[in-house]
Amino acid sequence: MTHLLDKALRVRVRLGAPALAALALSLSLSLSLGGCTQLLRQPPPAGAPLAEVQAKLGTPRAVYRLPDGGQVLEYAGQPMGQFQHMATIGADGRLVSYEQVLTSEKFATVKIGRSTKDDILRTFGHPAETSRVAFHNYEVWSYRYKEAGVWNSMMHVHFDEGGIVQQMINGPDPMYDDRFRFR
């Protein structure tokens, strides 16, 4: 990305401001639309076989086995996106559900003191970031999402040494707001 900006700045000298603005707009659109392909795809219908799901959605980032013989396919939007889709395939090899899981409603289903890292992975997929809180020796998984469909937020899931969720804290996503960036 830095290389492209350096090149654009050098081009400005030769092209002038209007041409540079057009170049910046075209670069911005191509980068932003490239990340939207997952959002623009129509999900396969419920009951579709696994092969059709993968043909339509592509190779999942991860596959999680379920105790009943089914599986959950993770179609990632993290680390930069605010959406993460999970396709649940039943033991019969057919699509049961396909949903965007990074929502306040879905986060509310996590059981403090009972949910495990495996539960969180199967429910939400891989986090955008991981960190540690030394005071409690917690591992923290952070997920970007749109709180109430509006606010750029992060949900921080705190695990104890046994991998059990001890607390969840949401707040503004510093990636989208300079006031909350660490300096």
Where are these regions (language model features)?
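Sec-dependent N-terminal signal peptides
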Residues: 14-27
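C-terminal motif of bacterial Sec signal peptides marking the signal peptidase cleavage site
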Residues: 33-35
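Residues within mature, well-folded domains
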Residues: 37-183
